[in-house]
């Protein structure tokens, strides 16, 4: 077999495959026998038609059948011989074959490209790292969240107040007050004072009681268009929050000694959570900086395949997401970023000869168990599953690659108060 490879881009290849008649004669004879079993000729039993008769009457059909069934076989042999792993289905063209002659054809396919990493200097990459500074309001909010989780719910008969929950039906009505058929929302929970039941809607709902009705204006699309709904109250509920006393602290955090200690422990946990948030954002910016530095080419088929899987997952997990083309448009940049990083990462792993051993994985699991002794058994059980160990192995490799990139990164540390984050969040909600 003669194989001529042509490189048409960093990821595209074209193979010209040429097999002599001597190499394929035996396979062609086998094709004749298989064809004979399927053909029906008067005076002959299936499989017993003489070769000469078959070739005289059906040679073009036999040749076409042979080509169709053999191209893939010889293509795979050529790939094995050249030690090539394609990432897509090859596109076959220029097929030439007749009995007694060479069998020639061409296949265009894509491979995972080799990525060239430019020479890295000490400050090749520039990345910001945000260090968050928490405050007492963060602690208060965390405690309030815990209190809401253990609140006692009471039915209210004397009228709704701010922060009460109104259980109601919402019937959309037209400008004349007539209900619109098919536009009724039943048994909805709304919180008084929470968007969109603030402002004018809040004033209408304050003091409302079970059995009463009012009209509210509610946004119905992303553009902010509103419709009028008749709101019928089924019930009003109020959350009675527990006091932050010794009993509450024992229930919320048995290891806390008193209120001050409880608040301190919450502040520590919040600090660790914000540190993790900071590290995650930094890692994403670091990979983005490296992607921009290298900007590798990627095979279109690879991107299309990965994007297809992403779209399937989105539609599977979100039944309301039905516009496939819109989802593809949204997630295409995400898929392309992932593939660029995947190619860069693999190149670094190969160049630096990185590996993650079983001992590395077990050491990380042991470290997790030591840090969380109460969850040691659960962790052991979780990481017995091969897919979870494989995911951990991949995470450890990611950390190793990112640690390598930090050697070539100028890091600008910036401080951000969490109160500024809260202001940003409030601004986003209002806009």
PLM feature segments, named:
Residues 27, 31, 124, 143, ...:
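Core FKBP-type peptidyl-prolyl cis-trans isomerase
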Residues 110-151:
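Internal alpha/beta scaffold segment
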Residues 86-94, 142-163, 211, 269-272, ...:
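Phosphate-interacting basic helix/loop segments used at nucleotide- and nucleic-acid interfaces
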